[in-house]
């Protein structure tokens, strides 16, 4: 499928390693880094490479969550991945793939596993079937029990430079000024930068935030009003962040 990770902003070292692994992937990976840096996006693309080769229709189904051999596991409104979800995952892992030679499980909030869930998964991670691959996503290795983390190949995602984020946004069709502003506010997180640059409600926060230095004065009342305005504008930003995290 050409350059598998060409739409990923930053993370060149990470995507180079995973590209090399596509023909013979490890049984389990732990993708760690801050929310919004692109871990889940890269995980899905890695799944595309493993399952689909040069089949674009297969790739689209993976990215849309429609491929029967890619299973997404997430808290689903709960505070943690539960033992019931873990047991269901173990049961599915023991089944043969539906279409190809491999079945991929993406744990989108691996750090949200409780101890019971981790223990339920442990035997499958210790003795995986040849057809099963786990992609566990978390903010830090410390978010998972050591017994789980030690059985995964760890891939670390760092924050991306403002320059690389701005360049990536421009490549996606975002105007230069908007791209640079979004990159500056994003804190090195391309996923957040994309929301800041492309969603109208989130862009309103960007505009308010960028205007603050020009509107500050010595009057305390102005500061309070600005703080209220920034807080109000941040509501859609927080909603977008939550949505991004859930879709990542």
Give a label for each model feature:
Residues 1-49, 53-62, 130-132, 139-248:
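Charged, glycine-rich active-site and insertion segments that engage polyanionic ligands
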Residues 94, 119-136:
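Conserved catalytic/switch belt of AAA+ P-loop NTPases
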Residues 32, 107-108:
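Residues at the beta-strand->loop junction immediately N-terminal to the Walker
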Residues 76-83, 110, 154:
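Flexible beta-alpha connector loops of hexameric P-loop NTPases
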Residues 83, 114-116, 146:
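Conserved D-loop-proximal element of ABC-family nucleotide-binding domains
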């Amino acid at each position: 499928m050409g350059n598998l990770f060409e739409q990923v902003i930053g993370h060149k070292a990470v995507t180079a390693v995973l590209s090399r692994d596509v023909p013979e992937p490890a049984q389990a990976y732990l993708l760690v880094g801050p929310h919004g840096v692109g871990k889940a996006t890269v995980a899905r693309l890695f799944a595309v490479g493993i399952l689909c080769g040069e089949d674009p229709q297969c790739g689209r189904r993976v990215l849309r969550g429609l491929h029967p051999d890619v299973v997404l596991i997430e808290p689903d409104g709960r505070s943690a991945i539960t033992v019931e979800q873990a047991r269901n995952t173990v049961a599915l892992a023991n089944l043969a793939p539906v279409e190809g030679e491999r079945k991929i499980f993406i744990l989108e909030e691996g750090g949200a596993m409780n101890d019971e869930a981790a223990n339920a998964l442990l035997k499958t991670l210790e003795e995986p079937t040849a057809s099963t691959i786990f992609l566990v996503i978390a903010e830090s290795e410390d978010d998972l029990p050591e017994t789980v983390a030690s059985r995964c190949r760890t891939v670390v995602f760092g924050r991306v430079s403002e320059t690389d984020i701005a360049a990536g946004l421009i490549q996606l069709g975002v105007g230069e000024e908007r791209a640079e502003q979004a990159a500056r506010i994003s804190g090195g997180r391309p996923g957040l930068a994309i929301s800041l640059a492309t969603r109208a409600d989130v862009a309103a926060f960007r505009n308010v935030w960028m205007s603050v230095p020009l509107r500050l004065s010595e009057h305390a009342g102005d500061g309070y009003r600005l703080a209220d305005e920034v807080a109000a504008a941040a509501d859609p930003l927080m909603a977008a962040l939550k949505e991004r995290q859930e879709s990542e």
